[in-house]
Amino acid sequence: MPSLRKRVKIQAENAEPKDECSFFSELSSGSEEDNKEDSIWEPQKKVPRNRRQPASKGSKRKQGPRAKKSSQQVDDESKDVAVKEELNSPVAIVDADLEEKSHKLQTTKTLKTAAKKQKKPVPRAKKRLKVDEETSQASPLEGGGSNVETPSTSACGNVCKKEESEDSFTFGQSPVKRIRTESCPQGRPARVPDGVSDIKEEVEMNWDVVQVLSERTNIEPWVCANIIRLFNDDNTIPFIVRYRKELINNLDADFLREVRQTLDELRDVAKKVHSRIQKIKKEGKMSECLLQALLNCKTFEELEHVSAPYKMGSKGTKAQRAKQLGLEGAAWTLLENPGQLNLLSYIKPDVKGLSELNDIETGVQHILADMIAKDKDTLDFIRGLCKHRYICIQSSLAKVSSKKVNEKEVDKFQLYQNFSCNIRTIHHHQILAINRGENLKILTVKVNISDGVKNEFCRWCIQNRWRPRGFARPELMKILHNSLDDSFKRLIVPLLCREFRAKLTSDAEKQSVMMFGQNLRQLLLTSPVPGRTLMGVDPGYKHGCKLAIISPTSQILHTDVVYLHCGQGFREAEKIKRLLLHFNCRTVVIGNGTACRETEAYFADLIMKNYFAPLDVVYCIVSEAGASIYSVSPEANKEMPGLDPNLRSAVSIARRVQDPLAELVKFDPKHIGVGMYQHDVSQTLLKATLDSVVEECVSFVGVDINICSEVLLRHIAGLNANRAKNIIEWREKNGPFINREQLKKVKGLGPKSFQQCAGFVRINQDYIRTFCSSQHTDSSGQSQETAMVTNEKLGKKKNKADATLIPNPLDQTCIHPESYDIAVRFLSFIGGTMCEIGKPEMQQKINVSLGKEGIEETAERLQTTVHTLQVIIDGLSQPKTFDIRTDFDKPDFKRSIVCLEDLQVGTVLTGKVENATLFGVFVDIGVGKAGLIPIRFITEAKLSKTKRRRSLGLGPGEKVEVKVLNVDIPRSRISLDLLRVL
């Protein structure tokens, strides 16, 4: 901190009350020699954060006579060129006369610099980056093509601001952000969308949103800036992840969601700050220092701490009541000139609070304590101090818990009844468990800050920040010591505890929601089992087991109810066998709900006896979470009218194996039932994350626009329920879509929506050819074919050129329409044709071309980025039937069953991950009870390279090989060790 500044002597003993925060910018540490000296001092002006000082009126530039034009001078328009000031650059107010005399010299030097740069251009990529409209409007030199910058008004003396090359600018204002690659260690420019302006938040604060976002998410500032711009431009996460990788440094969707959540939090804080500012202004309590303190707030806890004294209350704070008694001047005098302070002069026997000297000392103490607790430098010091000291969170059994809460509920929190852990090492699931116990009045939680923190804090305050300006009598130093102690215990410690608890809870909730999203992604991307006739079984006791047989195309073939657990098992077995043989069904899908274990044992026994011969029947267990909710929903009633809701559940269970993604998107993802503490976290955050994960999965898998359902279509990036409905109506009215461009004709689908969704909708070319050929055989002849291919009636304003629509083979790939011209040039470069898309010949030509010339050189030749070219290569080489879900695991089909009593320690088994939490992974090993792999046994070495990524960790559906560590039969608990991922 800077050295202490000496303060002006106070002539009067009863000094006028000053601004309560004006002292904050002046107090700082000082040497012992300053106490002996009593010289007059002058307060220094507070330096702004951006270090820019506006020029005074007298220093404005005087316009002299215009110089004659020459080949080395700028034309008249060049005076309007805007120069982007660099952050933290030295600032000086230029004298008007000096500036006028040196103006011509500055311009001449600038022109010479520009001329030299034109002679020695920096070799860069062939495709130059575009600057925004402000830079493009600057007039070029008459003799050259580069823009000329006028001398910066903030430059010191005759030093001219260094001119940057055109390639060094992104968005037209800030320096270009670079991405490091192996072939280009210094980084290559990240291309940005045209027309993107600088980041301007709706609500301005004293902190930079990009910098704070980077600090909280641990992501590079330039990446955060690009992400903010992309989100401000209404881009969706799937679109950004696939088609804007170069702007986000190849981050995955989980990181983008984290950035968006943090950004929303910061914006919510900013909005609440300005709302609180307006409220305080209306009450007439606003001061400049309070305004700056509010604008410095970055969290809700800081905002509440700063604005708490100004809330409407009956009594106000202790400091406010002391100020109303006129003791604020005494507090300032104690700090600035303690030798002139006489507390006896404040005694007024007839005024409560001023009648005794002890009351006056207490009032001054409260004012000083409030000043200390509101000082930014003091809070920054104590926060930094806590980062390097032992701070623990403790939980214990509440005294009244045994009287009001059930004993079974208390036993659930046995681990936390005498619990203590460092806040830097505590696990997220422990925080959520402690919070739940506290909310249920079972646990008492507190944060313990060691005494060493208090001692060092008080020592720093006395010796540095809050050191009096001059000699202070012992009784005054006692007041100051009491103020520090009171401020620390009563104000600062509660604030720190709230901040620690809020940070721990926020991080734990985010991790819990992220884990829920990862589990949901694994379920949605479970590999489908197409081409099979399936029997879905919804188990039950009294009301029987509901059966539903569906065709390979998900059509309902038969529904029935059988009573397997009511003494009629043998007779019902004949019915089941008859149904399986009649529909040639070899796969049974059993829901994991009530009576699942008994139903599984029933089918396993029949299969082991070869009862269904000649059919080789297998079965699998799937989660039926959400099936009952969906069965009574309007969507289910519309899809399966007239069918009993109980039978709809059986249909849904069967379809979850045939096409999990298409079935699971039909209901709210929070009902799927994978995750941890989902009811304890923010429901808004949970819903936003799960909806985003569903959108991500559906978009990356892609949909066939001509056959997909409305429910699936509404989850595509850029679409919603209304747009999906309009697309279906357009398809029913005009026939199938011939190419992606026709999406622009759908009502409510503007350019932005088309940009976001176009790359994720596919148009099957075989389906289009079949449709067109069917029109040839129609009795109406060629005229009807043309009418159907156009997909709309010709109006008066329609051109004949619009009547004929030509299918585009690129519409069946993941290539975005904005890259079609690059894809065509790439095909020409490798000697390929549209007919070879998705065939082995295309892959061979791509490999030969990239073998001769690497992908980076090819990207430069095509004037595009490596990421865009990679998407084009993937789209051209992937087979027409490519599905990203084929890389994920399929359901585990079984023929036999194992009991819990059969397990032995050391037995090696294979199983399927059922759920993943922050403390471990639950694995279904076929014994009716899932075993737990503690998180300490899931090491990076046991995971494959593809599973080490943050978004592809162990999740539901993963097949693993485990070893039994412990079997607790009375408690039905199984401990497992992960051997490897299958």
UniProtKB/Swiss-Prot annotation:
Highest taxon of source: Eukaryota
Pfam families per the UniProt record, alphabetical: HHH_3, HHH_9, S1, Tex_central_region, Tex_N, Tex_YqgF
UniProt keyword Lipid metabolism present: no
A biological process term (GO) from this entry: nucleobase-containing compound metabolic process
Modified sites of kind Phosphoserine: 951
Cross-link (Glycyl lysine isopeptide (Lys-Gly) (interchain with G-Cter in SUMO2)): 84, 130, 161-162, 942
Sequence ranges of Basic residues compositional bias: 46-69, 114-129
Name of this protein: S1 RNA-binding domain-containing protein 1
